[in-house]
């Protein structure tokens, strides 16, 4: 057993914002990995452009000083330099745009999901529905998720981030997420999963996620939705497929073996 596997078996990773954090949270999905890699690649161009512009400004200030140039130059046209300062930015934009298009496409792509999670935002809580289990159960799994008040927090729980009912999903599985709202605009955002999607009343938005490792992932509503906007946390717990089915069995009554064979094909 490798050290990494040992750590994964002994601990549950917590992915959440930290005080004074400047960087990204650790990615748990291929989409978030792509976002971070694209950000790092883009920073090369941004830093290079900033350095070049600052150098040009410094050269202009030092070379075209009134004391050094009593008579200003009368250059009114330069075809070569105009072609250069038009073509180079265009090439830079193309270099940035092409990878971003591929990333945007992958964020919208839904690949044969085994679970559909319905998310409904309300003032000021989230509602969740698992309806795929209707194939082997009489009713869907529906529950609300409220923030745990500070006085009710247990040891080890986090202020303004913990909820009474977590979203539980399996790892290494394609999951479709359908998001809407019942009253005003909300936004379902989980940084570690690379998800930030608006919840709009009367409209159904769709995204997908493929979580690669077990852990607990924290997020919050990121659309100002009223006085308690800051008290709408999101907690997604990713577990193994067997643990997910065990959790589902404790919520609803169904045959465990039937679910494995009929629904998941294993």
Curated annotation (Swiss-Prot):
The protein, known as? Cytochrome c oxidase subunit 2
Q: Which PROSITE patterns match?
A: COX2, COX2_CUA, COX2_TM
Residues binding Cu cation A2: 221, 223, 225, 229
What's its job?
Component of the cytochrome c oxidase, the last enzyme in the mitochondrial electron transport chain which drives oxidative phosphorylation. The respiratory chain contains 3 multisubunit complexes succinate dehydrogenase (complex II, CII), ubiquinol-cytochrome c oxidoreductase (cytochrome b-c1 complex, complex III, CIII) and cytochrome c oxidase (complex IV, CIV), that cooperate to transfer electrons derived from NADH and succinate to molecular oxygen, creating an electrochemical gradient over the inner membrane that drives transmembrane transport and the ATP synthase.
Q: Which CDD domains match?
A: CcO_II_C (cd13912)
Its domain of life reads Eukaryota
**Which gene holds the coding sequence for this protein?**
COX2
Q: Which residues lie on this side of the membrane: Mitochondrial intermembrane?
A: 1-43, 104-266
What cofactor is needed? Cu cation
Topological relation to the membrane, as annotated: Multi-pass membrane protein
Q: Name one GO molecular function term.
A: copper ion binding
- Positions contributing to Cu cation A1 binding: 186, 221, 225, 232
Q: Would the keyword Ubl conjugation be found if you checked this record's keyword annotation?
A: no
């Amino acid at each position: 057993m490798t050290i990494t596997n040992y750590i994964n078996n002994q601990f549950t990773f917590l992915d959440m914002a930290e005080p004074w954090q400047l960087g990204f949270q650790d990615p748990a999905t291929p989409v978030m990995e792509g976002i971070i890699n694209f950000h790092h690649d883009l920073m090369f161009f941004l830093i290079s452009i900033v350095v070049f512009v600052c150098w040009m400004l410094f050269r202009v200030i030092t070379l075209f000083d009134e004391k050094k140039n009593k008579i200003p130059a009368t250059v009114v046209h330069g075809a070569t330099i105009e072609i250069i300062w038009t073509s180079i930015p265009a090439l830079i934009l193309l270099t940035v745009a092409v990878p971003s298009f591929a990333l945007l496409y992958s964020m919208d792509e839904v690949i044969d999901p085994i679970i559909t999670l319905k998310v409904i935002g309300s003032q000021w809580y989230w509602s969740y529905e698992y309806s795929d289990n209707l194939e082997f159960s009489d009713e869907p799994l529906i529950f609300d998720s409220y923030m745990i008040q500070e006085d009710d927090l247990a040891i080890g729980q986090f202020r303004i981030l913990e909820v009474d009912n977590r979203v539980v999903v399996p790892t290494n599985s394609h999951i479709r997420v359908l998001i809407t709202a019942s009253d005003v605009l909300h936004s379902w955002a989980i940084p570690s999963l690379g998800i930030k999607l608006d919840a709009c009343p009367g409209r159904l938005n769709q995204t997908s996620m493929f979580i690669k490792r077990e852990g607990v992932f924290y997020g919050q509503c990121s659309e100002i939705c009223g006085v308690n906007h800051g008290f709408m946390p999101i907690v997604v717990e990713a577990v193994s497929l067997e643990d997910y089915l065990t959790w589902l069995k404790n919520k609803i009554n169904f045959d465990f073996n039937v679910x494995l064979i009929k629904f998941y094909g294993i």
